[in-house]
Amino acid sequence: MRAARALAALGAAFVLLYAGFVLGQQSAPTDYKLVSEDVLAAIDLAKEIDSVRGRELRLSSAVIAPDGHVGLHSHRGDPTIVYMLSGVLTNHHDDGTTEEFHAGEAFAEYGPRSHWVENRGSAPARFIVANIHHQ
């Protein structure tokens, strides 16, 4: 009888301890709280690529030194979004238009239009590049 009571008391203590542990656990939230999001640039991928086979989603950091450039190219089949971290990047399109992008700004390049970029400034142009790249 004494052993049965001791076993019952031990079992009850275990249940209470386990229940306290379980109740003390915080479950993961399923909502968003105190979050803001601004879409800086977007590309409709269905219009740009037929299949993701042989592709990878890539996020890169890049720097163009003062007086540096990336030569004329297009992003047909390689849609790309650029987010400027610092410096200034001048973007030249094949239609003759030119745009300057500064820290905190973003731009998208896609489709058959060609462009080239240069750093006309005195500081490095630092930026993040996200693209769907051919492997």
Where are the model-predicted features located?
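Short acidic-glycine-tyrosine-enriched beta hairpin
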Residues: 64-65, 95-112
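A short beta-loop-beta micro-motif enriched in histidine and acidic residues
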Residues: 52-55, 68-80
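Glycine- and acidic-residue-biased ligand/ion/polar-headgroup-sensing regions
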Residues: 75-95, 105
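Short histidine-centered beta-strand/loop micro-motifs
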Residues: 49, 70-75, 93, 118-120
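Ligand-binding loop in jelly-roll beta-barrel domains
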Residues: 112-135
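Conserved hydrophobic/aromatic beta-strand scaffold that supports enzyme active sites
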Residues: 59-61, 81, 106-108, 129
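A short, N-terminal "cap"/entry segment at the start of jelly-roll beta-barrel domains
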Residues: 3-7, 12-58, 92, 100, ...
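Histidine-centered metal-chelating micro-motifs
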Residues: 69-71, 90, 107, 111-118
